A protein has these predicted regions:
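Flexible loop/turn connectors
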Residues: 1-94
Length: 94
């Protein structure tokens, strides 16, 4: 799912329909989120998610902003793409 809050909604919808997400669940439904929401370990089943390194993302954003401010509008190349490693938090939902 796009984020953990959407994945939590998917867990609730699955439960309403009698589905049991997870490796041991019926029907082969596995649900995972993205952003390691603090409540993810406490859902039923516990939500699998990908944790983001928010400190690295924040540092990169501030560095880029400072670079832009010091460039007097002379930065070329347009937007930059920077990838960050995530950490899989494998739990019961997947």
């Amino acid at each position: 799912c796009a984020n953990d809050r959407v994945a939590i909604g998917a867990l609730r919808a699955a439960a309403r329909h009698g589905l049991a997400p997870g490796a041991s669940g019926k029907g082969g439904l596995r649900i995972a989120g993205h952003d390691d929401y603090p409540l993810a370990p406490f859902t039923t089943p516990a939500l699998t998610t990908v944790a983001q390194n928010v400190e690295a993302i924040g540092n990169a954003a501030v560095s880029r902003l400072i670079e832009i401010l010091h460039s007097d509008g002379k930065l070329g190349g347009g937007p930059q793409v920077q990838l960050f490693e995530g950490t899989l938090r494998l739990r019961e939902s997947a």
